[in-house]
A protein has these predicted regions:
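Serine residues within intrinsically disordered or low-complexity segments
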Residues: 2-6
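Anion-binding alpha/beta catalytic cores of soluble intermediary-metabolism enzymes, centered on
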Residues: 7-199
């Protein structure tokens, strides 16, 4: 069994297949921004084969291709956008400056942040409507992923509290909803106030 599929052992495959099938139908453009992480590249290889979304890797193409070659990972057909050399850098620098104008971020500071961290570039692509979603956190801290999302995308209108949730699937179907739990919020607001819960 491959490393990517081994984590599915014991999981409710019907639940996962529903998610996969929805992905195959909608063909959303999903960004992954950890080109140095073998696990991310293996996941992309699996995604390319299964067609559950249109993956795009953000980061250094040479680094990604080097890791892929060394580990025997096939990334054929994958679009890789270099956040340091992208033709759209000016667009995203301007967008970041606009999003962070209350902090008086200038173009030089914005460029340093965006070229220094692919997660920020990916979040700006989502904010601009150039992608449907972004996935990170395999090797990037929750803090950095959340910061990029909050700074670049922000919460929905009339929402102040940003939160996270996790799906946990257990082999014991007598627990939760047929063995499936949704946990919120272990990553961002683990001890919410009543107002934060209401938000």
């Amino acid at each position: 069994m491959s490393e990517v599929s081994s984590w599915e052992q014991g999981w409710d495959m019907e639940f996962l297949e529903k998610i996969y099938e929805r992905g195959r139908k909608t063909k959303k453009k999903i960004l992954l921004s950890e080109p140095h992480d073998e696990r991310v590249l293996r996941a992309i290889e699996s995604i390319l084969k299964s067609g559950i979304c249109v993956p795009v890797l953000i980061g250094d193409p040479e680094e990604a291709n080097g890791v892929a070659k060394k580990q025997g990972i096939d990334l054929k057909g994958l679009e890789i956008i270099d956040n340091k050399k992208s033709k759209d850098l000016d667009k995203y620098v301007a967008l970041y400056c606009e999003k962070r104008k209350h902090k008086k971020i200038n173009s030089e500071e914005a460029l340093k942040i965006i070229t220094g961290n692919p997660v920020f570039y990916a979040s700006l692509m989502v904010s601009a409507g150039d992608a449907d979603g972004s996935v990170a956190g395999a090797s990037t801290t929750t803090r950095d992923v959340a910061k990029a999302a909050i700074y670049c995308i922000g919460p929905a209108e009339n929402i102040k509290t940003v939160s996270s949730s996790s799906v946990v699937i257990l082999g014991d179907k007598t627990l939760g909803s047929s063995g499936i739990f949704i946990y919120a919020d272990a990553g961002i607001v683990p001890d919410p106030t009543a107002d934060e819960l209401a938000d």
